[in-house]
Structure formats: C-alpha cells, structure tokens
Amino acid sequence: MNAFLLSALCLLGAWAALAGGVTVQDGNFSFSLESVKKLKDLQEPQEPRVGKLRNFAPIPGEPVVPILCSNPNFPEELKPLCKEPNAQEILQRLEEIAEDPGTCEICAYAACTGC
C-alpha cells in the first residue's frame, strides 16, 4: 500500500512538473524556468563594436534599459521586466538561476515553484 502511494505521488509530481513546469518568481513577475534558462545563452561575450557605440552617462530620472533587453534572442516572456526601473537587478537574480537551473528544478531557491 505504501509503495503504491509513493509511486502515485512520484507520478503525480512528474506529471505536474511536465504539465505546468517550474515557475521562477521575482517580485510581481513570474516566468517559466525555460525562459530563464535562455538567459545563459545570451550572456556569452559578444564582439566589441569599436567606434559604433559610445558610453554616455544616463539621464537622471530616466530608466536604464539593460543591454540584454535589446538582444533579438531575448525571451518574449521576460520583456515586460525591461520596463522596470530595477530591471538590471532582476536580470542579475534571474541569471544566477540560469547559471545553475538544477537547483531551481529541485526548489532550492525560494523563488522557484512548481517542482
């Protein structure tokens, strides 16, 4: 009886993980773990564009949009956070999870649910 119950719980957990997937939450934002994992691929160093871009000081009071948000491969699901004034901080936290998604898949981070 106990073995049957344990097996049923394991199957139910596996089904829930496949059906709903793991959700990463940061403040009012919720994202699928799959979208967060895509950030790792975007972090790869890109060739510097010498002479094309110049560093300008940000205008006070204007939000600073992280460079990552302008990447054409940036996940659609994450784009709403680019409009937030603290987008860079949120992206840094999500990038930490993207670096080691296994700990999120076992719900080691409080921000991860749906394991």
Swiss-Prot record:
Per UniProt, subcellular location reads as: Secreted
Q: Name one Pfam family in it.
A: Guanylin
This protein's GO cellular component annotations are: extracellular region
Signal peptide positions on this chain: 1-21
Print the keywords alphabetically: Disulfide bond, Secreted, Signal
Disulfide bond positions: C69-C82, C104-C112, C107-C115
Tissue expression notes: Highly expressed in ileum and colon. Found in plasma.
Q: What is its main location?
A: secreted
**GO MF annotations in UniProt:** guanylate cyclase activator activity; hormone activity
User: What is the purpose of this protein?
Assistant: Endogenous activator of intestinal guanylate cyclase. It stimulates this enzyme through the same receptor binding region as the heat-stable enterotoxins.
The family classification in the record reads: Belongs to the guanylin family.
**Name of the molecule in the record:** Guanylin
Per the UniProt record, the source organism is Homo sapiens (Human)
Could you tell me the gene encoding this protein?
Answer: GUCA2A
